[in-house]
């Protein structure tokens, strides 16, 4: 019996070891996944996962793991279109997605002072962010994304501190239908009701809120 049990135990230990390696979220982030097509996240999002604003790569650090996991799934399925992320997500296993999403949530993220609907709203971007435009069925951004757009759980990601280029690109993707991974097309309806100038203004508002509060 020993001659049977020991080999089986060895195989089991090897499998567990392989799974542990595959589930090393930090390694996936900095070096890439088991599939060579799953390139290291840090290449575009930075070693600290704070993103690269000039290139339009968003901050990932501190974002809820459930949200990040869903985005990876959506890139893989095509519900969220991006020529860089789609092949990377397709090359990641479910286990690798879980691991890297958990790693991202644990990474340090900037803090932002709570800015809500009671604050003064000066300018187009601030008015949309804090008051909305209900006559056009545009709710204020902070109603869902939280004070200062800090993000709320797995459903509403942080807006504060993301680059204006990234935020504007996402709003335009919803307007154009290339991003369609929100429940009941909520963001699609909102984005399509906004003008080009409003998209730019609200994107710059949240980008600047982040810079002001983090001292950048």
UniProtKB/Swiss-Prot annotation:
Renumbered to this chain, the signal peptide range is 1-22
Query: What's the short name of a Pfam family annotated to this entry?
Result: Cytochrom_C
- Entry-linked Gene3D superfamilies: Cytochrome c-like domain (1.10.760.10)
> Which UniProt keywords are listed?
Heme, Iron, Metal-binding, Repeat, Signal
* GO terms for MF: electron transfer activity; heme binding; iron ion binding
Quote the record's binding site residues for heme c 1. 41, 44-45
Domain (Cytochrome c) ranges? 23-108, 118-210
- Write down any Gene Ontology CC term: periplasmic space
Which residues are involved in binding heme c 2? 141, 144-145
**PTM field:** Binds 2 heme c groups covalently per subunit.
Tell me yes or no: is Heme among this UniProt entry's keywords. yes
Quote the InterPro entries the UniProt record gives: Cyt_c-like_dom, Cyt_c-like_dom_sf, Cytochrome_c4-like, Cytochrome_c_Oxidase_Subunit
Describe its function. Answer: Acts as an electron acceptor for the thiosulfate dehydrogenase TsdA.
Give the protein's recorded name.
Answer: Thiosulfate dehydrogenase electron acceptor
Origin organism is: Stutzerimonas stutzeri (strain A1501)
Gene (name only) = tsdB
């Amino acid at each position: 019996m020993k001659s049977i049990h020991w080999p089986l135990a060895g195989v089991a230990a090897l499998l567990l070891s392989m799974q542990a390696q595959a589930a090393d979220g930090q390694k996936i982030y900095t070096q890439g996944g088991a599939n060579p097509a799953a390139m290291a996240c840090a290449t575009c999002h930075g070693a600290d996962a704070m993103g690269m604003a000039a290139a339009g790569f968003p901050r990932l650090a501190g974002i809820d793991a459930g949200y990040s996991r869903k985005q990876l799934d959506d890139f893989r399925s095509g519900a969220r279109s991006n020529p860089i992320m789609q092949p990377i997500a397709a090359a990641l296993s479910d286990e690798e997605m879980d691991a890297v999403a958990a790693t991202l949530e644990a990474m340090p993220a900037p803090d932002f002072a709570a800015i809500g609907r009671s604050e003064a709203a000066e300018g187009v971007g601030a008015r949309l962010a804090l008051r909305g435009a209900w006559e056009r069925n545009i709710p204020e951004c902070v109603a869902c994304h939280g004070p200062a757009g800090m993000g709320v759980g797995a459903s509403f990601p942080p807006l504060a501190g993301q680059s204006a280029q990234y935020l504007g690109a996402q709003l335009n993707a919803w307007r154009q239908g290339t991003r369609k991974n929100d429940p009941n097309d909520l963001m699609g309806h909102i984005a399509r009701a906004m003008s080009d100038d409003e998209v730019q203004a609200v994107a710059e508002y949240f980008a600047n809120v982040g810079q002001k509060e983090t001292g950048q």
